[in-house]
Amino acid sequence: MSEFWNNNKDTIGAGLKTVGKYSYKSTKFVAKTGYQAGKSHYQNSKAKREGRSQEGSDDSGQTTPNVHINYKDPSAFPPPPVKPGQLQYHGSSGNSANGSSATIPTLSNTNNTAQLNEQPYMNQINSSNQIYSRPQMAIPEQQVATPEQQMNSTTLPSQPQMAVPSQQEHIHIQPSNPQQLPSNYKPQEQYLQSEQLNISDRHAPQPMERPAMPLPQHGNVPPLTTENVHPNIEADISSPAVGPQFEVKPYDWEEQKTTKIEIPQVDLTSIPPPPTHRDRNTSRQGSNSTPPSRTHTGNNTSTASVTTTGIVDGNLESNQEHTPKPAILGEYDDTLNVAYAPPPKPFRRATNNSSDLKLSGAQNTKTPPPPVVLTNKSAERPNSSNVMPSLPLRQMNTKANSSENLPKAKILGEYETNVDVGIAPPPRPTYRKTDTEANPPNRPLSRSTTEHKMSSISRDNYNSIKSSSVKPPVPKRNTGEREGAQELKADIAERSQEITPTPGISGIYNLDKKIDFAPPPKPFRRAQTSSDIPQKSSLVTDESNISVPNKSQQPMQEKDSIKNATPLYIPPSNNINFPPPPKPHNKSLEESHTPSNKLSEKPKPPKKPEQLKDLNLSTQQADKNMKNKDQLFDNKNELLSTIKNKKRPAPIPKPKPKSLTSEGNHMNLNTEKGKETTIEKPDESKFLPISSFPPPPKPFKREELSKEVVDSVGETADFTKPKRAGQLESTQTEKSNSKGKAPPPVPKKRNAQSKSSPSLEGSEDNPFSKYLKDAVPNEPDRLHK
């Protein structure tokens, strides 16, 4: 590491200097840029705050910027509408309102560019109003109090009526002053006025008269304002306008009740009938109009789609009756009769042996039906091998049947049924064969078309064909080649000469190909046991299941016979015998019986093995099974010998609870055969015979170690050592005869205390009980209980 630093310290130092230099420059640049941006932002915000406060000082401290200077002068707007019977205010021109007559304000057409630009737009509005004139409420036009122009005001009479006169009037504009309109004047005012008046220059059907609904009584309505106002143009006002003066008239409730709304009666006979449905042969009565032709429709589409019927005085215009009306997508001729071919009938195979099902030796061809020709008589399709005769065609009217030999167009065009399709037919469905079927059961029906002949398929490559009627016999199960393969091949070869190759779903299958896979095993099924099966010796498969000898007089001879047993040779037969499965160990049943009963009772004979289903094994398979059984017997004998020679572990003493009585602790020790002590058997005896080992020694309690039994310290020391079975039985019999009851077990860690302190014989289990007696003095009885 030192050499690396000595060699590269100059380079590292130069690099650090360069990095520090550029980092300083970048930091300085970022700091300057941020300072300048913050400073400029502060100055801009300060300037905005100062300008806002100066502008808002006149407006009683408004925080929003004052932009009312960009609005239009209120004097340029028309006055608000008046109520029915209310007098209009007097303008600067001094003209008074006349309540008896309703006049239309006239305007003069000046040379103003704004008005010139407005004329085409107004003409367009008038032409649109000509199409359908909707009745509007009579809102009068008020006078605009400007020095540049003055308008005549109108008032409504006491009874509401339409403000549209019966005659057509042209709009005349009378110039009051030679001056032009101000620059801020917009054509929206005249647009609103023209829309309310609904007066057009052209002669058009006038709308039906409808009385205007009276306006509700409200306060002063705010003036109508135009939406599109240029914000940068200021209104130059030369002289102040005169304020409006209103006269309010109370609303009359009885006037609405006395006014009757007249509904005109429309003559329904003069209305043209609705269009009829295309499938209906007869049209409705009272139709005076004929369906227009395509040429008239193309010429009058634009006019007919725009013009509507105008109703004047309950009469319809006569020119509307003969106006051509276009349909949704064209014209429909109800007299035409469309004759379509009926849908094909679904394929149904005949249940009986009909004459139309004919077998050929190699093929069964299907002839397609001829093309359908619509004639007066129903065209029937010829019967084929699997096609039923179709339904007859529907007979239409005589007009459609006039052209007999001309094929009619279908829904999407004409169809040709005799086109060759290069697709193989689908496989034949499988149905149950009837009793009257003349076909042989082993000869299947082959199905192919004339276009797809199977002559190119060589029989050398496909000698055997898998079909539904030809089923090879199930071969026997073995590990080598299949039995009867030669007979199967010969049988298939004979049948393949009579059967032509039949194409399957994905191709043709060859059963002659050799298959090297073993046959699948048959399912295992338990069969009933028979009495004629010879009883075999049960095999020991678990440590808990060891066969107990039947004869109690010669137990050792039986054990030796089991140890030296050799498996018997079983000839191959259809029935294969396996040993029964081991029984689960039940500890509760073992503890319920005493050892004396276990030795006296005879063991149950081994269960007979269950029979298996016939497996049809060959001699080779039987020999292989016998070899496996020999190996199995050898392994079981070795396992049995190792279990018997295994050394038994030392027993674990367990303390006996004090709740047990002395009767349960009594030990009946007799040297007779078949009787043993009633000690608790440890868990290690599950896998060993009971009679092979003596009972384990049981420790005694210190309380029962009297001077008669324990004479010296050496004898007590020998008590902890494991003794032989004979010595232990002799000592236990002497103590049981002298005391009459068995002492309880002693814990493990009490042996050392029994040597040094024999004075603790009368003490309890707690060794510290003598120290606890006077350790804490008794408290005085304060409560005198």
Curated annotation (Swiss-Prot):
Subcellular location per the Swiss-Prot or TrEMBL entry: Membrane raft
Pfam families: AIM3 (PF17096)
Superkingdom field: Eukaryota
Ranges of compositional bias, category Polar residues: 103-122, 143-199, 283-310, 350-366, 375-388, 395-405, 455-465, 527-556, 659-671
Its membrane topology: Peripheral membrane protein
Protein name: Altered inheritance of mitochondria protein 3-2
Family the entry assigns: Belongs to the AIM3 family.
GO cellular component terms attached to this protein's record: actin cortical patch; membrane raft
GO biological process annotation, one example: barbed-end actin filament capping
Composition skew (Low complexity), residue ranges: 91-102
Primary location: membrane
Keywords (A to Z) from UniProt: Membrane
Region (Disordered): 33-122, 142-406, 418-785
